Amino acid sequence: MHEQYQPLEIETQAQNYWKEHQSFLVRELPDKEKFYCLSMFPYPSGKLHMGHVRNYTIGDVISRYHRMQGRNVLQPMGWDAFGMPAENAAMKNNVAPAAWTYDNIAYMKSQLDSLGLAIDWSREVTTCKPDYYRWEQWLFTRLFEKGVIYRKNGTVNWDPVDQTVLANEQVIDGRGWRSGALIEKREIPMYYFKITAYAEELLESLDNLPGWPEQVKTMQRNWIGKSRGMEIGFPYDQASIGHAGQLKVFTTRPDTLMGATYVAVAAEHPLATQAAQNDPQLQAFIDECKRGGVAEADIATQEKKGMATSLFVEHPLTGDKLPVWVANYVLMNYGEGAVMAVPGHDERDFEFANKYGLPIRQVIAKVEGDNDFESSVWKEWYGAKDESVLTVNSGKYDNLGYQAAFDAIGADLEAKGLGQARTQFRLRDWGISRQRYWGCPIPIIHCEACGDVPVPADQLPVVLPEDVVPDGSGSPLAKMPEFYECNCPKCGQPAKRETDTMDTFVESSWYFARYACPQFEGGMLDRKAADYWLPVDQYIGGIEHAILHLLYARFFHKLMRDEGLVGSDEPFKNLLTQGMVVADTYYRTTANGGKDWFNPADVEVERDAKAKVVGARLKSDGQPVEIGGTEKMSKSKNNGVDPQSMIDQYGADTCRLFMMFASPPDMSLEWSDAGVEGANRFLRRVWRLAHAHVSAGLPGALDVAALSDAQKQVRRAIHLAIRQASQDVGQHHKFNTAIAAVMTLMNVLEKAPNQDAQDRALIQEGLETVVLLLAPITPHICHVLWGQLGHAEAVIDARWPSVDESALVQDTLQLVVQVNGKLRGHIDVAASASREDVEAAARANENVLRFTEGLSIRKVIVVPGKLVNIVAN
């Protein structure tokens, strides 16, 4: 055993052992309890960043801990390999996305191996390979035949120069990110998953996920957005519109209907089109609206704009004429593309009405307190629907609470055939068509005679050609007759293959299930294997995936269940959302007002006498730089730390230990070079103590019955550490406090006497405990030390230590003694001492006598096992 800790040598030795013994290869063992631990798989961008390292280390610690509990543990890994970055890199480097992707996968896989992750690589999936997406296409055809997938026109961002559809994030200030052209909104045929058919179940089954963070469940509930309201028909004013009809709106606030003063429609609404026919200004405004973003988030933040039309509708209860406006905040795909506006009691309508001088009518009043209604200043209570408000200025509906007004107005609308109660969801159907090359081909053939025909199962997969280098102008597949020319599977006539590809969220919506049976060729899933492993017991990933990915994966799991592929209702039993990795930022402002960012490694920090940071200089020129505070590690802020350089310098175990010790997993982790140094120092201490112990020769067995009082205290420290770490790792995932418990134990072991066989046997038990408790966190050093401590089997196959409760029992206790709440001393008493004995010992304490001299003792408070407080005056 080397005297010095040599991480590179140790880590190579451990990793070679795991590889040779296929330590992480698992099979279904029906008689053994399983544990499926999964970290969200990475996009193969080129190299790992610290966020990846944190995510995968957390998963690895949990996996290894459960293996030490005797469970059959699956921890797989794969690659979310389709997507736009590969196309962008391909255009930049003039290389096919496939080649770029596979090169990145090879490099990132070697990085994951260097971290020492307990991954079963025999189950690796790569989503851009036909053996994976073939089954996605198969499910698509099944769902298309059942009507769960359908085709309809959808609004997209169209770049007229590049002749392509852009994602919302590729539209910057209304222009294409590459071409700079003004973006148009276009209607094109797209495929949709009918996720709304599962909205109720997706909402209700959140209640069956106690192992999910409440924050994530709330975000999903809000996204699904179930609301009870009414669909109300506003009859057309035939004089202005020219024919009969109704403008249908959905509202959750029919109680405020008497306050409606106008209606607003989307730019694409038929009434907007009609009104613009003889109004060039309105047409120009509609065109401007169509150039705006199509995402709800864009619409929420953009300036609210509108324009009046010459059209009117009638108020369904009063018959009053209400003007029809076109507004940029109304979505055509929400309800029927129209909203009723009640400016008095909706903040968005209130701002809009004030901007354009539209009437604001109060129909709700606060019962008490500040109940003045001002039409120029919005107050929170205007939008209330609780017991603090009642209806006013509403004729026969006056003095009613929210529910009573809802019911009364609703009943009258239903009687007139102008309204019906409805439950609506904010959730929209999921459009998955992408006019891109690097994605899974949609398995549909368009035939003039037969319509849209799914590709038959025996003709799947529809293989994406991998030798294409996109140039950014339109979809490459649409320019490849060899790809799209085909015959109709139904009638045999010449037909055209669909050239759109699927949203990459589709691949990540079912990968967790394919890990159960990645080589299975008899179907999408092997039901037996899927039912053994699923649901995932612990899923780990960033909070940024709280809505889309996690919602789509839950949806897909239910689709697969209804297809008979899995037996469970939910994919992920427990969810851990890890925090970000943040680091200091430094910059200089450039002449044009921009910022040049400098990596923390290139900056020297200046501190005052109290070690507070007072300035920073660039090492290369010695000149000052601005301190930008701590932010998420990113390329844009140049504050990332390359994991590979850390592993090369300190070893993977140091990286892993720092990551787990610096912060609880669900909180942000602040990168600190000093913290990494500290983690490395601690591992060197463990190695040093073990080396000294092993060099002296391994001791015989410990005789627990013959321990001295001092030795009992050492053994108690060992078992306190086991108890603490078992709770922290196994129950709470508080790895930082588990590590702190091991550090406390190390302090005890380093000071423990080393005189006789009992002392050495006790240090042996202590070191074995340190190694076992650290094994999930720093597996390489523990692999080597376990062997050096005399064990034939590898630590990967060892069991987690159990607490010897008898070791925790104390013959004597040390109690704190206070006088009037202030610490005045300590007393040692027998663990079995009575309250009277404890009080007598406290009163007799030398310090207590000094601080109570001349005072009357009023009472003595004894907290058993902890303290005595003497109250005197």
Swiss-Prot record:
GO BP term (any one): leucyl-tRNA aminoacylation
Catalytic activity: tRNA(Leu) + L-leucine + ATP = L-leucyl-tRNA(Leu) + AMP + diphosphate
UniProt keyword Endoplasmic reticulum present: no
Keyword Protein biosynthesis annotated: yes
Coiled-coil intervals, chain numbering: none
Enzyme Commission identifier(s): 6.1.1.4
InterPro entries xref list: aa-tRNA-synth_I_CS (IPR001412), aa-tRNA-synth_Ia (IPR002300), Leu-tRNA-ligase (IPR002302), Leu_tRNA-synth_edit (IPR025709), M/V/L/I-tRNA-synth_anticd-bd (IPR013155), Methionyl/Leucyl_tRNA_Synth (IPR015413), Rossmann-like_a/b/a_fold (IPR014729), tRNAsynth_Ia_anticodon-bd (IPR009080)
Motif ('KMSKS' region): 632-636
GO CC annotations on file: cytosol
Source domain of life: Bacteria
Subcellular location: Cytoplasm
Chain ranges passing through the membrane: none
Binding site for ATP: K635
Chief place where the protein resides: cytoplasm
Motif 'HIGH' region, residue numbers: 42-52
Region Disordered, residue ranges: 624-643
GO MF annotations, alphabetized: aminoacyl-tRNA deacylase activity; ATP binding; leucine-tRNA ligase activity
UniProt similarity note: Belongs to the class-I aminoacyl-tRNA synthetase family.
Protein name as catalogued: Leucine--tRNA ligase
Organism: Pseudomonas aeruginosa (strain ATCC 15692 / DSM 22644 / CIP 104116 / JCM 14847 / LMG 12228 / 1C / PRS 101 / PAO1)
Gene that specifies this protein: leuS
